[in-house]
Design a protein with these regions (language model features):
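Cell-envelope/glycan interface and biosynthesis
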Residues: 2-95
Length: 95
């Protein structure tokens, strides 16, 4: 696994996979840099290909401050290390 750091300003439009760009993993507080585990991007790409539908990342990398502002978020969340993402698959309902 390779954890990489990206600049939102410089690398935001960069494709990590055919369907995911760096900016989609950005912390919602707009901070820079963004950390993304390459394996996470590849896994999300595989999910998108499996369902054949767009996948929207609702939470990717989080700074410690942003993570602390989320009710119920673990202080040891893998989001802090670019190893987790919350997402939804368009058109797919979760039972």
């Amino acid at each position: 696994m390779a954890l990489k750091a990206y600049s939102l300003a410089r690398d935001g439009a960069l494709h990590l996979t055919p369907h995911f760009r760096v900016r989609e993993f950005a912390c919602r507080d707009g901070s820079d840099p963004i950390f993304v585990e390459e394996e996470l991007a590849a896994l999300l790409e595989a999910i998108r290909l499996h369902f054949g539908c767009p996948v929207a990342i609702t939470s990717g990398f989080r700074t410690a401050a942003h993570n602390a502002s989320i009710p119920g978020a673990s202080p040891h969340s893998q989001h802090l290390y670019g190893r987790a993402a919350d997402f939804r698959v368009e058109g797919v309902r979760v039972a």
